Each structure stands twice: as C-alpha cells, then as structure tokens.
Amino acid sequence: MMRQSLQAVLPEISGNKTSSLRKSVCSDLLTLFNSPHSALPSLLVSGMPEWQVHNPSDKHLQSWYCRQLRSALLFHEPRIAALQVNLKEAYCHTLAISLEIMLYHDDEPLTFDLVWDNGGWRSATLENVS
C-alpha cells in the first residue's frame, strides 16, 4: 500500500532526466550496500565472513540469498518497479551480483553489477549507467 502512494507521488520523468534518475538509483544502492549502519540485513551487505562459512556452491543458499536481497531492496528503494537479482560469482572469497532493474517511468531495463572487494562493495557498472 505504501508503494502505491509513493508511485503516485513520483513525477513523470522526461528523457533528459532518465539518465540522472538511473545514476541516482545506482548511487543510492551502492551507498545502501556500503553503509556501516545499512538497513539491509548484514549477510546481504557486509556479512562476507558469514557467506564464507556457508557452502558458496549450494544452489539452495544462492537462491535464498537472491530472494532475500530482492525483497530487502524492493522495500528500501521505492523507485524500483521490478527487480531480478542474479549471482554472477559465488566463490569462497568472491561474490558478484547483478541487479536487473526496471524503474518507474523508465521503459529500459537497468543492469547494475556489484562486486564484493576488500571488505566492501564496488560497482562494476556505475560509470556506464546512462
């Protein structure tokens, strides 16, 4: 119900503003992932030691991780209309995810890739977002 009211309040986006909207969403997501007091569950953003304890090749665990991350991101980012989370890499010390995002008032999908690197998340695609 809250998402519906937020959607109604969001202004229509013109072509020129679409690029800045896409960059803003990606920047805000990266900030959310790297915040020391992130609203996302710790395993989803900074819990890599916890990830390494589990079997990273476990498909059930990977599916659970993607579902949990998708749910949390949809809750915290009202500009996202649809989201698909995919693991690109899930090895003992490497975790790379790809977010396939559809934004409200934007007909083109947005792909945002993140990689866990040296204790934090970095964007593999933020420079290329347009």
From Swiss-Prot:
Major subcellular location class: cytoplasm
Coiled-coil segments on the chain, per record: none
Gene of this entry: iraD
GO CC term (a single one): cytoplasm
Similarity comment: family membership: Belongs to the GpW/Gp25 family. IraD subfamily.
InterPro entries found in the cross-reference section: Anti-adapt_IraD, IraD/Gp25-like
Cited SUPFAM superfamilies: gpW/gp25-like
Top-level lineage group: Bacteria
Protein name: Anti-adapter protein IraD
Upregulation: By oxidative stress. Low expression in exponential phase, rises in stationary phase, translation is repressed by CsrA via translational coupling to the upstream open reading frame IdlP (at protein level).
